[in-house]
Swiss-Prot record:
One of its GO terms (biological process) is DNA replication. The gene is ccrM. Its EC number is 2.1.1.72. It is an enzyme of class 2 (transferase). It comes from Brucella canis (strain ATCC 23365 / NCTC 10854 / RM-666). Belongs to the N(4)/N(6)-methyltransferase family. InterPro entries: DNA_methylase_N4/N6, DNA_methylase_N6_adenine_CS, RAMA, RM_Methyltransferase, SAM-dependent_MTases_sf. Keywords: DNA replication, DNA-binding, Methyltransferase, S-adenosyl-L-methionine, Transferase. It catalyses: a 2'-deoxyadenosine in DNA + S-adenosyl-L-methionine = an N(6)-methyl-2'-deoxyadenosine in DNA + S-adenosyl-L-homocysteine + H(+). GO terms for molecular function: DNA binding; N-methyltransferase activity; site-specific DNA-methyltransferase (adenine-specific) activity. This is DNA methyltransferase CcrM.
Length: 377
């Protein structure tokens, strides 16, 4: 299936159906002009690193190292690179949703310059992630430390972007119930995952491992979100997005990379809905006021609540407070007071009786949340 759209053939701020799940061929800045404002949820950018290589690099056996010496990684000066970086970041910021986030990966050659531009343009830095490579290239000349990592910057669109997605509980669960740290250990792309041409040569010199992109998407997006990659290359972002039930839009100007990415993405089988469910914590759930339970008719004023052992009791009042022992307050405050504690989760402490069985009032809160979800709230 053809995924390719020509940038110059797309209208300015083209409708979603014209660019979703496609590769736009063209320069990244001009192609981004075709996308509407606030149209993407997450951006992953792997821009040219501006490696400033001064010549060929050889191994001790005099074989030449395959390095990035392509024309797209060459700039006249740092000033030219900075101007390029500012242009594509500005274009990305326009299409990023107010609650969206951007990931930029780079090496020591460029990541600090990119970070400065991000802050100057109003992005708000959330984390820097160190990708530690299990199998990095040696330093053949022995004049520097072995360069064994790359750096990712994760940023929200601005300081006010409070509603961005971070699947904290899922990341923690995937890390043996320990908080996910900001240093990630992955091998560089090798073996069957590395795309090769008919001569057995690498299709792209800086192909990123799918595991890296999968972690980024699982951490900062939801199924159905739109992931933009303005430097699409061999299509790792598109392949992972399709497999994980996300939409993608890639921008690439080099036809050989577009051809390889198209074939790669067409071969991907998406995961099923059950496999894509993201584990969420209570912080991700919508807030429910106790009065909402009463307004829905699930509890009535005058209802007597108690703890699961029936040691303490409180009466529900019409204003949504509880009263016990001459005091009135929230479900949390009264739960704490009757126990002599400083704090209490009233939703799990207080129970109501239904058909002779005690149930936590949290069960009623879940009903309200289900109703909110059905209403799209």
């Amino acid at each position: 299936m053809s995924l390719v759209r020509l940038a110059h053939e797309l209208p300015i701020e083209a409708p979603r159906t014209a660019w979703l799940d496609s590769i736009i061929k063209g320069d990244c800045v001009s192609a981004l002009e075709r996308l509407p404002d606030h149209s993407v949820d997450v951006i992953f950018a792997d821009p040219p690193y501006n490696l400033q290589l001064g010549g060929d690099l050889h191994r001790p056996d005099q074989s030449m190292v395959s390095a990035v010496d392509d024309h797209w990684d060459q700039f006249e000066s740092f000033q030219a690179y900075d101007a390029f970086t500012r242009a594509w970041l500005l274009a990305c910021r326009r299409v990023l949703k107010p609650n969206g986030t951007i990931w930029v990966i780079g090496s020591y050659h460029n990541i600090f310059r990119v970070g400065t531009q991000l802050q100057d343009l109003g992005f708000w830095l959330l984390n820097d992630i160190v990708w530690r490579k299990t199998n990095p290239m040696p330093n053949f000349r022995g004049r520097r430390f072995q360069n064994a990592h790359e750096t990712l910057i994760w940023a929200s669109r601005d300081q006010k972007g409070k509603g961005y997605t971070f699947n904290y509980e899922a990341m923690k669960a995937a890390n043996d119930d320990v908080q996910m740290r900001s240093d990630w250990l992955f091998p560089i792309c090798t073996g069957s995952e590395r795309l090769k041409d008919e001569n057995g040569d690498k299709v792209h010199p800086t192909q990123k491992p799918e595991a890296l992109l999968a972690r980024i998407m699982m951490a900062s997006s939801k199924p159905g979100d739109v992931i933009l990659d303005p430097f699409f290359g061999s299509g790792t972002t598109g392949a992972v997005a399709k497999r994980l039930g996300r939409h993608f839009v890639g921008i690439e100007r080099e036809q050989p990379y577009i051809d390889a990415a198209t074939a790669r993405i067409n071969a991907v089988e998406p995961l099923g809905k059950a496999e894509l469910t993201v584990m969420t914590g209570k912080r991700a759930e919508p807030r429910v006021a106790f009065t909402s339970v009463m307004e829905a008719g699930l509890l009535r004023p005058g209802t007597v609540l108690c703890d699961e052992r029936r040691r303490f009791a409180a009466i529900v009042r019409a204003d949504g407070t509880l009263t016990a022992n001459g005091e009135a307050g929230s479900i949390h405050r009264i739960g704490a007071r009757v126990q002599g504690f400083d704090a209490c989760n009233g939703w799990t402490f207080w129970h109501f009786e239904e058909n002779g069985v005690l149930k936590p009032i949290d069960a009623l809160r879940k009903i309200i949340r289900e109703q909110m979800a059905a209403a799209g709230a």
